[in-house]
């Protein structure tokens, strides 16, 4: 990874994620060597690993694997949104979309918008938060969007 480790997200609990809240995640550079190594290992399609084949593809050059883009989003999410004190994981993701190619050298920034936040009916120590996460490139184009479901611990009694 070409970026220094960022500080962990501040301690927040379910109650700190009201519907409509927006969180900026910061940004990360798409390192060309990481694009190549990730694709060689996990997604070896020609437009990710072969410059000549990629030049002839609809993308006109090497692009990052969508899964690599999602992993960059996850780093920003873990460091800027999910509090280690309250994150209890996720039962899944809805509507994962790769909306535009991500190229080596791009700088991606992330934003989280809370769509809903509801206390769990069966487990009173937690809540369920559904968000919209969007990743944009340096031109402002949305390149990735998804709607994860997060389980977050409720604030402990004082």
What is each model feature region?
Residues 2-18, 98-158:
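HotDog/MaoC-like acyl-thioester-processing domains
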Residues 2-92, 157-158:
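Hot-dog-fold acyl-thioester-processing enzymes
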Residues 95:
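Short aromatic/hydrophobic contact patches that present stacked aromatics
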């Amino acid at each position: 990874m070409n970026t220094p480790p960022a500080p962990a997200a501040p301690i927040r609990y379910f109650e700190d994620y009201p519907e409509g809240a927006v969180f900026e995640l910061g940004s990360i550079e798409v390192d060309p060597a990481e694009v190549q190594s990730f694709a060689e290992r996990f997604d070896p399609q020609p437009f990710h690993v072969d410059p000549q084949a990629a030049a002839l593809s609809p993308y006109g050059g090497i692009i990052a694997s969508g899964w690599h883009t999602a992993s960059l989003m996850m780093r920003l999410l873990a460091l800027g949104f999910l509090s280690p004190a309250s994150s209890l994981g996720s039962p899944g993701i809805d509507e994962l979309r790769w909306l535009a190619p991500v190229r080596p050298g791009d700088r991606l920034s992330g934003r989280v918008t809370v769509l809903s936040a509801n206390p769990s009916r069966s487990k009173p120590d937690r809540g369920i938060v559904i968000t919209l996460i969007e990743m944009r490139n340096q031109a402002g184009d949305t390149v990735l969007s998804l709607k994860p479901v997060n389980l977050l611990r409720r604030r402990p009694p004082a």
